[in-house]
From Swiss-Prot:
One of its GO terms (biological process) is polyphosphate catabolic process. Processing by proteases in the vacuole may be required for activation. Keywords: Glycoprotein, Hydrolase, Membrane, Signal-anchor, Transmembrane, Transmembrane helix, Vacuole. This is Endopolyphosphatase. Residues 1 are cytoplasmic. Residues 570-640 are annotated as: Disordered. Belongs to the endopolyphosphatase PPN1 family. Glycans are attached at N134, N191, N463, N659. The chain crosses the membrane at residues 2-22.
Length: 747
């Protein structure tokens, strides 16, 4: 059983050491991976400068060897293997029952249809068998377990809901998230034999993980798929229980409300942020963009800003990770644009971003100004869409109906072709912000374990030169920063206050006519303060706020059910701010309106002034900085590791794949196979020949790949571009040849 909380770690000592010129790290009592100059014998692991990105495992307990792709590699529920003990058991069952053609195979001869093998069915819409998941973890254990520093795991740990004979239930969702999480726990829990002395053996739930593991929520990890509410909810609490060892204790409160968090993988130096991309996802009907404070996506971006700003102050660097990649076909327009700005305006600390979901291997060049321009030009109205509305709506429809995430191979090929067109529109160096191309950011999309093509894994390598010296010689005295729990509590409090302010403004604006009518009916000779509309407004707001229950529904995620709720309402309903930094424009407008009201008490003009006051307050509120948008990049800072080679700059990655077509044949013949992941390509080799993976290198590669669209008359360049594009397409579909398919891979 997995522990339900992280409190069992309280007795662990701080573990870490820098020795022999190598950085060593392990967990402390707070569950953080830390470094130290103290020579300890517990849980020591050298930092290798590598990490694993794994995504979209999709284990399917109903996967059946010998089944066909059109049945999602499932057999009929009344089928029994024991009756027909044959490797191709479904085919035997069909023959024995006289059902040569399946009733939903549309007249196709079942015996001639390709059958699922032991490790899966490539180039199909089938999920992966349990045998593939087990073989994948075995290979990781035997080959890279001791060579990586952390794991970014970008979700989708459950089969698709694509077969109404086997409907997914909520307990299935949690069950397989638990199973996949347990695989990581078993493999990376401290083991005395492999990881050194200091513990009583491996496998005990009280022993910590030896490296950080950072999972993200996938669109198939929720019930129903794609649909995810703002928390706290049963689902968010259950996922927190399953991921309790992955989510730092100080952030569990935030996770229960938004299912996003971060881990410091090298404390004080490097972190990984796990985004909940379902709040940005077009196919999530419970999310409506990132423009309103009541949108969970808006709050998510505000949280992201708080975390990035704090990390900038601490001198840290950070990777962003998530399930759904930031492309216009996937994201709500406002979320797409705002995230692009966050990626570029924090270019001093963001090292890169990695995603899954699409099962194909490619990268996205993000240019926020281009995105903004395209959105504003669409039908002449900002925010209505990027490029074609029709295309967006079709994409959403395909996403909802097609079993393979967004679309099948033929659609993905068309998508990749559109990516090339996007590459062709990237401007040359003369129009870049600087020589580092720092007005761009790169989102990396990794292929998946699920064998829609071939199962894949990606191992990144990053620069750790000088890291040992930095850790071994900390500044004197070391800087002191607030605890993350304090930072995040302040975020919740400030966000609740912002929403309270907006409630006041909107209430006043909606009721200003009523207030004016009551004011007109009043006696001009009465005491100046008696039944003053200003006072009536204050009392009405207090009454309205008092009726809000922040512990349930949407408001629970906004206000967080925090203990400071009463103090927050006190501040919000007071006519004077309780602190000097209270920046509500409405208070200032109230003061002005009150003075105008006194001067014009006996005339309508003065009362009209009060009516205008509400409008001014609303306008002033809108005029405040949108916290879901980043501030401008400080002029005194330089671009960071993503742009200029330095500590933590990505050096390259190795893409691995497993040719399960070959391994399926071996298993069918002998009942065993030499299953393995082998190198498909590395970014250091031809034709990329990257020395490091800076943004400029990716932008230049994209421009070469897009050359055919822009310079049709330059035959030599076109030829070079086409040759490179063929390599790119082959890698996009993991060497399966899917780019040459003429028909969709399933109906």
């Amino acid at each position: 059983m997995l522990p339900k909380t992280l409190t069992i770690w309280a007795s662990l000592a701080s573990l870490a050491v820098a020795q022999s010129g190598q950085v060593v790290f392990a967990k402390n009592a707070d569950g953080k991976f830390v470094h130290s100059t103290d020579d300890l014998d517990q849980g020591q692991r050298k930092i290798r400068g590598k990490f694993l990105h794994i995504t979209d495992i999709h284990p399917d307990p109903y996967f059946h060897v010998g089944a066909v792709a059109e049945d999602k590699c499932h057999v009929d529920p009344d089928h029994k293997d024991s009756d027909y003990p044959d490797e191709d058991s479904e085919l035997v069952w069909f023959r024995a029952t006289g059902k040569k053609k399946h009733n939903h195979h549309k007249g196709k001869d079942h015996e001639k249809m390709p059958k699922a093998g032991y490790y899966g069915h490539p180039l199909s819409s089938c999920d992966g068998p349990i045998s593939l998941m087990n073989a994948t973890f075995d290979w990781i254990d035997q080959n890279i377990r001791d060579e990586i520093d952390f794991i970014i795991w970008t979700g989708d740990n459950v089969r698709h809901d694509n077969d109404n004979r086997y409907p997914r239930l909520e307990q299935d969702i949690f069950g397989y998230n638990q199973i996949v999480s347990s695989k990581f726990h078993e493999l990376f829990r401290y083991n005395e034999t492999r990881d050194g002395e200091g513990h009583n053996g491996g496998g005990d739930p009280q022993h910590p993980l030896v490296i950080p593991i950072i999972p993200s929520l996938g669109n198939n990890d929720v019930f129903p798929h794609n649909l995810y509410l703002a928390g706290p909810s049963f689902q968010s609490r259950r996922m927190l229980q399953i991921w309790s060892e992955f989510v730092p204790e100080a952030q569990q409160h935030i996770f229960s409300r938004g299912s996003y968090y971060f881990q410091e993988v090298i404390t004080g130096k490097l972190a990984v942020i796990s985004l909940n991309t379902l709040y940005f996802y077009k196919s999530n009907p419970m999310s409506d963009g990132c423009d309103e404070k009541t949108d969970p996506g808006y709050k998510h971006l505000v949280w992201l800003g708080v975390v990035l700003d704090e990390m900038r102050q601490r001198g840290m660097k950070v990777w962003l990770s998530g399930h759904v990649p930031p492309v216009e076909k996937n994201y709500e327009d406002s979320c797409h644009l705002k995230l692009a700005y966050w990626l570029t305006e924090y270019r001093d600390i963001i090292v890169g971003s990695v995603f899954g979901h699409m099962n194909i291997d490619h990268f996205v060049v993000m240019d926020p100004k281009k995105i903004e321009k395209a959105q504003s030009q669409d039908l002449g109205t900002p925010g209505l869409g990027y490029k074609s509305h029709v295309t967006d709506f079709l994409d959403v429809a395909i996403s909802a109906s097609h079993p393979v995430h967004t679309f099948g191979s033929i659609y993905k090929r068309n998508y990749i072709e559109s990516v090339r067109e996007d590459y062709s529109e990237i401007p040359g160096p003369k129009k870049w912000l600087d020589e580092y191309a720092s007005n761009f950011a790169i989102a990396h999309v990794s292929p998946s374990v699920i064998p829609n093509y071939f199962p894949s894994l990606r191992v990144w390598e990053y620069n750790i030169t000088g890291l040992g010296e930095e850790i071994g010689n900390p500044p004197h005295p070391p800087p002191s920063f607030r605890a993350w729990s304090d930072v995040l509590e302040e975020f919740e409090r400030d966000y609740a206050q912002d929403v309270m302010d907006e409630i006041e403004v909107e209430w006043f604006d909606a009721n200003s006519d009523v207030i004016e009518a009551e004011d007109n009916d009043g006696d001009d000779d009465e005491d100046e303060n008696e039944d003053d509309p200003e006072m009536l407004t204050e009392e009405a707001i207090k009454e309205g706020v008092a009726n809000i229950n922040p512990e349930t529904g949407t408001l629970a995620s906004i206000f967080g059910g925090l203990k400071f709720w009463k103090s927050s309402t006190a501040v919000a309903t007071s006519s004077e701010p309780e602190s000097d930094d209270y920046d509500s424009d409405l208070d200032a407008e109230r003061k002005k309106g009150k003075k105008k009201g006194k001067k014009g008490k006996k005339g309508k003009k003065g009362k009209k002034g009060k009516k205008k006051k509400g409008k001014k307050g609303k306008k002033g509120k809108k005029g405040k900085r949108d916290k879901s948008m980043p501030p401008k990049f400080p002029k005194d800072l330089q671009p960071g590791p993503a742009y200029i080679p330095q500590l933590f700059t990505p050096i390259g990655y190795t893409q691995y794949y497993a040719n399960i077509t070959q391994f399926n044949k071996e298993y069918k013949k002998t009942g065993a196979s030499n299953f393995e992941y082998v190198v498909e390509y590395t970014t250091n080799d031809a034709p990329y020949n990257f020395e490091h993976l800076t943004v400029r290198n990716w932008v230049e590669l994209a421009r070469v790949l897009g050359k055919n669209f822009r310079d049709l008359d330059l035959e030599a360049e076109k030829s070079k571009s086409d040759q490179l594009w063929k390599v790119y397409m082959d890698r996009a579909f993991v060497g399966t040849g899917a780019e040459y398919l003429e028909e969709p891979d399933d109906d």
